[in-house]
A protein has these predicted regions:
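Alpha-helical transmembrane segments of multi-pass membrane proteins
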Residues: 68-94, 111, 115, 123, ...
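Interhelical loop/hinge segments that connect adjacent transmembrane helices in multipass membrane
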Residues: 136-140, 154-182
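Helix-loop interface residues and adjacent transmembrane-helix termini in multi-pass membrane transporters
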Residues: 74, 103-104, 131-134
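Hydrophobic/aromatic residues within transmembrane alpha-helices of membrane transport systems
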Residues: 15, 19-22, 31, 38, ...
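Membrane-interface helix-loop junctions in multi-pass transport and translocation proteins
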Residues: 108, 119-152
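Interfacial transmembrane-helix starts/ends
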Residues: 29-44, 77, 180
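Short membrane-interface helical motifs at transmembrane helix boundaries
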Residues: 50-71
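Small-residue-rich midsections of specific transmembrane alpha-helices
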Residues: 1-23, 42-49, 88-94, 150-153
Length: 182
């Protein structure tokens, strides 16, 4: 997921700064507009990366030339790349929720939910990996499921901030005014 770490091109930091200013002023409309624009940039960049991973999952030898077609490692690489590609929206959700909670200086609430998810991931290692088990792909799928669950729980909690999900979805678009500002 290091590819996703820098894919926002600095727009998350900038968007966080401006959205926080709007939050402090009580300007909910422009706060959501700024977060929506930032989500649009993330969506654009992350979907390109997800598409790249999707293509590489068809031909994993592009990334790892030593893989033998139809081998167990070939299929493991393929499934892991597919799961990584499909989990892109979850990563975007994590980043957006992190912005919303950070703006309010309440990211500790998101961290609590994430901590429960992390504990479940750690405990699941004993199930997926053991003396007779080495279930890497199912483990990675489980981790992504936990990440999705954390995003859904945190998104549910965002309702306490009177965030309109529909209004936010409408704000996910390119906005020239915000682009020039950021």
């Amino acid at each position: 997921t290091i590819f996703f770490s820098y894919a926002d091109l600095g727009f998350i930091s900038s968007g966080l700064k401006y959205a926080a200013e709007y939050y402090i002023r009580g300007d909910r409309k422009n706060e959501i507009r700024t977060i929506g624009f930032t989500a649009f940039i993330m969506l654009s960049m992350f979907m390109l990366i997800a598409l790249l991973f999707g293509i590489i999952s068809i031909f994993p030898q592009i990334l790892m030339p030593e893989l033998e077609p139809d081998s167990e490692n070939f299929y493991t690489a393929r499934y892991l790349l597919i799961l990584l590609s499909v989990s892109c929206p979850v990563i975007i959700g994590q980043r957006i929720l992190n912005m919303i909670y950070s703006i309010r200086v309440e990211d500790y609430k998101l961290q609590r939910i994430s901590a429960v998810g992390s504990i479940l991931k750690i405990l699941s290692v004993f199930f997926f990996f053991g003396s007779e088990n080495y279930l890497l792909v199912p483990y990675f799928a489980f981790v992504q499921f936990i990440n999705l669950s954390v995003v859904l729980m945190a998104a549910f909690q965002v309702r306490k901030y009177q965030y309109s999900f529909v209004e936010f979805l409408k704000a996910i678009r390119f906005d020239r005014i915000i682009f020039d500002k950021e």
